[in-house]
Amino acid sequence: MAVVAHNEKEVSLLARLMRAEAEGDGQLGMLMVGNVGINRVLANCLDFTNITSIQQMVFQSPGGFEATQYPYFYQAAREVDIRLAQRVIRGEKFHPASYALYFYNPFDQGCRAQWFGQWNSGRYKSHCFYAPTQSENCFR
């Protein structure tokens, strides 16, 4: 069962985003980026209070994903990418991105303790992930 409402176009958007942001980190890295995207749709805090769909999340501006600014994002989603997107839409979570709202690539500088006021929840390959504290009440 899906944790967010979606249509076929939005599954493809999420799949393309996951690939464009994290293909170099393999399928698990792509799933973690997908977690961040779905978390932003589910979150009721920070810059995400008015984000209610995958489409809004992918193209949020300001504060959205850098990958949408590059041609690679606009390639068709592959079947494997679509299957990965469907997994996170169904609610599968992958630590350290389980509740993360942000991630970034530190380019081997190490993960900062905080990013946009969120605490580091861990690193996977080239990406550092950042999640809100429970006291921020981001998730219903």
Where are these regions (language model features)?
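Bacterial extracytoplasmic/cell-wall-associated proteins, especially those involved in peptidoglycan
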Residues: 2-140
